[in-house]
Design a protein with these regions (language model features):
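Conserved ATP/PPi-binding loop(s) of AMP-dependent carboxylate-activating enzymes
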Residues: 35-39, 43-70, 101-103
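Beta-strand->loop->alpha-helix junctions that form or flank phosphate-binding loops
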Residues: 10-17, 34-37, 124, 172
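Gly/Ser/Thr-rich phosphate-binding loop
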Residues: 1-29, 41
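AMP-binding/adenylate-forming catalytic domain of the ANL superfamily
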Residues: 160-184
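Hydrophobic alpha-helical segments, especially N-terminal targeting/anchoring helices
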Residues: 45, 75, 80, 179-180
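AMP-binding/adenylate-forming catalytic core of the ANL superfamily
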Residues: 14, 53, 76-166
């Protein structure tokens, strides 16, 4: 909103397999959105969004169908439901499991980018023999700062705001933007390619 004053932001939702659905945000800037519309049905099973569409593709070439016997597609998006509105929490493949406690990277990313001197951030899980996974944050800075100061500042800012297991165990300062060639935010194994 700061970069484009006067612009109304609205979420949209679509998948290659079913197309783009009509969407309505609860209010400007809200993360809660109502999706579906004519030709689309949605349901939530175990906090996962399932979609059925008249416009759905037939399937993948030489691969099993992504649809169940009734034509429903598991999107693998984890959502919360509030009346007719849903809020996307993340993908089930992004869940980080720290000693049995689960978190979505987006929660930690949103806190990190709200901090001073943090231009951008990504968060991922990294395998750990003791905890299963640990939280790893990669940040881009606005201005140069020592790694020691950044780590101390981030941990201090997050302490008390989130549970201890959500605080990044490793913090990496990246020299380049964290987007791939398709301008999507890099995650998981993509992050191994980011120069630090």
């Amino acid at each position: 909103k700061k970069a484009f004053p006067g612009i109304v932001l609205q979420q949209t939702y679509g998948l290659t397999e079913v197309g783009i659905m009509s969407s309505k945000s609860r209010e400007d800037g809200s993360l809660w959105v109502k999706i579906g519309g004519q030709g689309f049905d949605t349901k939530i099973v175990n906090n996962r969004l399932w979609v059925k569409a008249q416009s759905a593709m037939i399937g993948y070439l030489n691969s099993p169908s992504p649809f169940d016997d009734e034509g429903w597609l598991n999107t693998h998006d984890i959502v919360e439901l509030d009346g007719e509105f849903i809020r996307f929490l993340g993908r089930d493949s992004e869940i980080i499991n720290v000693g049995g406690e689960k978190l979505f990277p987006a929660e930690v990313v949103n806190l990190l980018i709200s901090l001073d001197n943090i231009k951008d951030a990504t968060v991922r899980g990294e395998q750990n023999n003791l905890m299963g996974q640990i939280v790893v944050a990669t940040v881009n800075l606005i201005e140069s700062e020592t790694a020691r100061d950044v780590k101390r500042r981030i941990r201090s800012a997050l302490k008390g705001k989130v549970a201890e297991y959500k605080i990044p165990h490793k913090i990496i300062i990246a020299d380049t933007d964290q987007f791939n060639e398709r301008f999507k935010r890099m995650r998981l194994t993509d992050m191994e390619k980011v120069p630090t």
